[in-house]
Swiss-Prot record:
Keyword terms of this UniProt record: 4Fe-4S, ATP-binding, Chlorophyll biosynthesis, Chloroplast, Iron, Iron-sulfur, Magnesium, Metal-binding, Nucleotide-binding, Oxidoreductase, Photosynthesis, Plastid
HAMAP family, alphabetized: ChlL_BchL (MF_00355)
GO molecular function, one term: metal ion binding
Protein name (record): Light-independent protochlorophyllide reductase iron-sulfur ATP-binding protein
Cofactor: [4Fe-4S] cluster
Binding site for Mg(2+): 14
Compartments where found: Plastid, Chloroplast
Cofactor note: Binds 1 [4Fe-4S] cluster per dimer.
Family: Belongs to the NifH/BchL/ChlL family.
Protein role: Component of the dark-operative protochlorophyllide reductase (DPOR) that uses Mg-ATP and reduced ferredoxin to reduce ring D of protochlorophyllide (Pchlide) to form chlorophyllide a (Chlide). This reaction is light-independent. The L component serves as a unique electron donor to the NB-component of the complex, and binds Mg-ATP.
EC numbers on record: 1.3.7.7
Family annotation (PANTHER family): LIGHT-INDEPENDENT PROTOCHLOROPHYLLIDE REDUCTASE IRON-SULFUR ATP-BINDING PROTEIN
Enzyme class per UniProt: oxidoreductase
Amino acid sequence: MKIAVYGKGGIGKSTTSCNISIALARRGKKVLQIGCDPKHDSTFTLTGFLIPTIIDTLQSKDYHYEDVWPEDVIYKGYGGVDCVEAGGPPAGAGCGGYVVGETVKLLKELNAFYEYDVILFDVLGDVVCGGFAAPLNYADYCIIITDNGFDALFAANRIAASVREKARTHPLRLAGLVGNRTSKRDLIDKYVEACPMPVLEVLPLIEDIRVSRVKGKTLFEMVETEKSLNYVCEFYLNIADQLLARPEGVVPNEVPDRELFSLLSDFYLNPVNTSNESTNSSIEANQEVESSFLII
């Protein structure tokens, strides 16, 4: 199974990807996570350091693939998850899609691409040009990471459009959305009502999820010394279980941009004000109590 993880920049894709990778490994699967970002920090919480990229390694070997060994590019991470960082071209030059293609080509040369039960591509931001949409060419499923915010859902909609386009020529399906670190999900529900797709999980606003990234650890590693975080790991295990069940997934029909803009902005500007309703109910109740005292 091959999974591509997308989402708005800074939404927590890498943190989520690393925890999902470990959750899949905990279910007995052999997992490889491939970071597809020039920052090459996708696997940081799995390995604890920034591992050398495939592009760096190929450059050092003058692009002689026959001189590259698996241990030159594949690093063992926490929980038995293998890690690869594709890297990227110099800033302002080259194409990220080419880098992803070279990464897959090298892994095939090393007979490593087909050795894993699950390969997870963690892809740069919400850039869905032909280059950074390249991992969708290899994926069985796409997962979109979002939160309950306007910008993240707008990006999710553009990614959904890319999935639909790639699904024309590849056996690709959208497995669903994952809400990350959000105290509410009303806007997520509003979006999936307009653009039907599964919601695999919504992780609550837990500060330890953000802190884990700073510590360079996954939640699964942190729970070894902080048992109170065990319940957080269950969210990722639930996502893993759904993926391993080989869901049918969907080919999404994205909402037109202007229509989505109106839908989401209207939800912000004209929210259902339940707080006012509850306040009015409290006032009415107090008035009834006061009246009863007057009668007595």
